[in-house]
């Protein structure tokens, strides 16, 4: 049984959440910064992800190799990731090595060096990462899609930055952003595993007792840049003309979620439409028709905006047919909701998956962190199961109807333009009828 996590606020504003799991032999420590790419001005675009690369380069006492050796010695692991709203770096260690994890956190948070030579080295690594992403059609399609639907809002920019923005970052900018955002009052430390709340609170006190070095009082922790709600996503049909064997197709609707219940329903709808090999769209488009290798749905949820998207990599000549299936299946949900038998199957799957995740300290840490960052609270496995079981067919119908009737969908296709005039005219007619906008053709 997963009991709710316990929370503590330190004098300097740092928040600690602890999930006690005495049955485990490990501990996961995650440091979450409430800052991501949406909080970057144009001059700092890409700096959050840049810091993800720099954070484990070490400090005054331990360099990058020292950190790696310390973690390897105990058979542990460490990693980091950046999203549009958060940055996380985390350690996975034997439960007896909690003190090591805290010492490493202190080193990288209190005394980072961000040496110029390391910045130059990681700059080249990130430029290669950007190039690699552009060469991955699926990732590139999603980046272009986010840019289209969020317009000029920072949420629409990709997380990595571009060549010009990365070349424009320097040590001064990296430190400025770090000191302004990597502050105790703007962070959450999540600990999950074989550790008591009192022990975790005692060990982490070194991070919570006083202001951190170079974080001067009165310096605003989080500027308002990027914090204005992005608003409803922009409808449209964008066709990016790119010669390839496969077409990449995204169909999405603005999908407001106003409560935890809505998030659960959204996840259920995602599972039903494109959550795996038993999903409706996977069965229809891949298994029955053989049009695609990859097809899935994705509930993209932020603090103040949500998008429900469906993606497929299909044969170029099947783009319009695929879009019609996407539109038809989503429209069908507005009339009938998810059939009771399918709903029961998905509810079982979600509950069992949740229970299986409790056997891993890192999964548990991610779960309690997400709950804290989005809802300021944690839920037990019993409460989660109860919430999932409470969803009825009529609930899925109501949310699907809210999404579909709330505005026109957004569509992006990365593919060669159809050669036949008649086929292109059919695509244009579909755009006008479904999205309420004219089809926009762009060069790759």
Model-derived features with residue positions:
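Charge-rich, well-structured scaffold segments of protease-associated domains
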Residues: 4, 9, 20, 64-216, ...
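Active/ligand-binding-proximal structured segments within catalytic/core domains
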Residues: 13, 20-71, 145, 182, ...
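His/Glu-based metal-binding/catalytic segments typifying zinc-dependent metallopeptidases
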Residues: 21, 30-32, 218-280, 387, ...
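A generic "binding-loop/recognition-motif" signal
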Residues: 14, 196, 277
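Active-/binding-site microenvironments in catalytic and ligand-binding cores
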Residues: 25-27, 81, 195, 228
């Amino acid at each position: 049984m997963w009991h709710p996590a316990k929370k503590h606020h330190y004098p300097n504003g740092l928040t600690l959440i602890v999930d006690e799991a005495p049955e485990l032999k490990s501990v996961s420590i995650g440091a979450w910064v409430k800052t991501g790419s949406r909080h970057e001005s144009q001059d700092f675009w890409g700096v959050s992800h840049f810091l993800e690369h720099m954070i484990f380069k070490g400090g005054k006492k331990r360099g990058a190799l020292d950190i790696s050796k310390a973690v390897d010695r105990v058979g542990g692991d460490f990693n980091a990731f950046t999203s549009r709203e958060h940055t996380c770096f985390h350690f996975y260690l034997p439960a007896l090595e909690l003190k090591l994890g805290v010492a490493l956190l202190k080193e990288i948070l209190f005394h980072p060096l961000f040496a110029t030579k390391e910045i130059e080295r990681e700059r080249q690594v990130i430029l290669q990462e950007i190039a690699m992403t552009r060469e991955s059609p699926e990732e590139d399609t999603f980046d272009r899609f986010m840019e289209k639907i969020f317009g000029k809002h920072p949420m629409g920019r990709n997380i990595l930055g571009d060549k010009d923005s990365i070349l424009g970052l320097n040590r001064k900018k990296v430190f400025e952003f770090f000191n302004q955002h990597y502050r105790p009052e703007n962070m959450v430390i999540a600990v999950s595993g074989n550790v008591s709340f009192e022990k975790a609170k005692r060990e982490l006190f070194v991070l919570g007792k006083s202001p951190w070095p170079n974080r001067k009082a009165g310096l605003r922790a989080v500027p308002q840049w990027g914090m204005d709600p992005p608003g409803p996503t922009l409808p449209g049909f964008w066709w990016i003309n790119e010669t390839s064997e496969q077409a990449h197709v995204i169909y999405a609707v603005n999908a407001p979620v106003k409560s935890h219940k809505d998030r659960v329903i959204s996840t259920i709808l995602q599972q039903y439409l494109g959550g795996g090999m038993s999903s409706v769209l996977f069965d229809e488009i891949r298994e029955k028709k053989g049009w695609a290798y990859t097809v899935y749905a994705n509930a993209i949820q932020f603090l103040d905006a949500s998008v429900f998207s469906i993606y497929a990599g299909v044969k170029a000549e099947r783009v319009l047919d695929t879009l019609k299936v996407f539109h038809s299946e989503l429209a069908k949900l507005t009339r009938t909701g998810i059939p009771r038998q399918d709903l029961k199957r998905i509810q079982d799957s979600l509950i069992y998956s949740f229970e299986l995740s409790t056997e891993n300290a890192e999964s548990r840490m991610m779960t309690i962190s997400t709950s804290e960052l989005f809802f300021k609270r944690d839920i037990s496995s019993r409460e989660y199961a109860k919430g999932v079981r409470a969803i009825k067919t009529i609930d899925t119908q109501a949310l699907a109807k809210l999404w579909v009737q709330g505005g026109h969908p957004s569509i992006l296709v990365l593919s060669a333009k159809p050669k036949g005039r008649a086929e292109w005219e059919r695509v244009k007619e579909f755009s006008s009828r479904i999205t309420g906008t004219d089809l926009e053709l762009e060069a790759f």
